[in-house]
Amino acid sequence: MAKDIKFSADARSAMVRGVDILADTVKVTLGPKGRNVVLEKSFGSPLITNDGVTIAKEIELEDHFENMGAKLVSEVASKTNDIAGDGTTTATVLTQAIVREGIKNVTAGANPIGIRRGIEAAVATAVSALKETAIPVSNKEAIAQVAAVSSRSEKVGEYISEAMEKVGNDGVITIEESKGMETELDVVEGMQFDRGYLSQYMVTDSEKMVADLDNPYILITDKKISNIQEILPLLESILKTNRPLLIIADDVDGEALPTLVLNKIRGTFNVVAVKAPGFGDRRKAMLEDIAILTGGTVITEDLGLELKDATIEALGQASKVTVDKDSTVIVEGAGNPEAIANRVAVIKSQIESATSEFDKEKLQERLAKLSGGVAVIKVGAATETELKEMKLRIEDALNATRAAVEEGIVSGGGTAFVSVLDAVSGIELTGDEATGRNIVLRALEEPVRQIALNAGFEGSIVIDRLKNSEAGAGFNAATGEWVNMIEAGIIDPVKVTRSALQNAASVASLILTTEAVVANQPEPASPAPAMDPSMMGGMM
């Protein structure tokens, strides 16, 4: 395929046009008074959203060179979303500001490499200053504040803070669609896995079709149990204690399953059997998790253990187990807290080194199950369009809250960027590097300027007053008042703020140092096929 190539100023100006088109579309959503953008979908109703990364991903431009510029900014939004889960619109605004100021200077004859070094030095200083001013987030009220600011809903803030309190900061919090119109929170405490009872005759509550086991022993094995004789000595030992038994095995079939069911029906023995969760190596890891949580041992040939030799000491224990046809929940396992903490630490290190998103997600699920439970926020809305928009907002809020817990918070509304201006301007640089620093100084004002503009105020006036205000003061764009941002609950996570700046500077620097752009030439349209003369008989 033939290529179309542009060089130097032509290349950069074409890409900048794409940057501006995407950024101008996204930045109208910034702040509490940000507007919505309507996205056409190939089927179904249009999506109305103010989520920066969702909008950025939808933009595709006809001109190949402009499209490359737009896609680079979209990459900034996506990367910021991946790292911090929020701040995508801020990152887009910062990218446009750095590119716009940078291009002016490069066109005027400045060296792009020198400008890039200045930008990098300024951003490193700004990030250090942001981290120094960070306020730790630890209590429920602060978590609710962060979530409420991100989602623009105090109710959502309450749900997220309550969920994090119940399942821990590392716990799994999922967002699902509710069957009703109300948004609600559902918390499953303890370890849950998606395996139900192997026979409905094992239930203890025939109305709800669930099996409740109080203070049970738990047999954990990766073997298939087909012969009841293999576990008969163990069953006799448990029978003497008059406690129920949960069997977690690869499978229970042959004569073993009907024998267990028969004893359950007769009231001789309260037992429930379920299949082990997961597959392959993941199954082994999950069985080990269950064993550590309950203080038991996995009966496996890998450890040289046989079912026939298993004793009551090898069994796990829990205060309660609930099993329905689809899932099993183990509450308050009797495992050693130190062993559980060590296992959690191992899984955390595996998450950090995982390269696959799928592996990372599965490891986080295991971590949550060991840490204390799963919370589900069920989103309700009057229409499908509203439901989609609400889900996106809650996802952003959840990510922002986790980021805040991780690295702390700073004052919101873009004021944190303005607060580091003195630190950045204090860097001693010369020549083009000083120009790079000045570009960042101008860009750091842009989020506040855009938030004010979206709320119907003059951005330059807000910036001037902010620079002359005392530390902590800022402009509340929602009300048009000047307030102490932290006290007013207008806050941003440090991780979101610094990720937006770092990613914006990285991609903007690449655009400024671009000297050639290579694009595919559009293929000419195929000519229409000639009409067959034999089909023109009636026209002569």
Curated annotation (Swiss-Prot):
Q: Name one GO cellular component term.
A: cytoplasm
Pfam families hit by this protein: Cpn60_TCP1
Q: Where in the cell is it found?
A: Cytoplasm
- List the CDD domains: GroEL (cd03344)
Detail which positions bind ATP.
Answer: 29-32, 86-90, 413, 476-478, 492
- Chief location of this protein within or outside the cell: cytoplasm
Keywords associated with the record: ATP-binding, Chaperone, Cytoplasm, Isomerase, Nucleotide-binding
GO terms (BP aspect): protein refolding
Name the protein family. Belongs to the chaperonin (HSP60) family.
UniProt function note = Together with its co-chaperonin GroES, plays an essential role in assisting protein folding. The GroEL-GroES system forms a nano-cage that allows encapsulation of the non-native substrate proteins and provides a physical environment optimized to promote and accelerate protein folding.
Could you tell me what this protein is called?
Chaperonin GroEL
**What lineage is on file?**
Bacteria, Bacillati, Bacillota, Bacilli, Lactobacillales
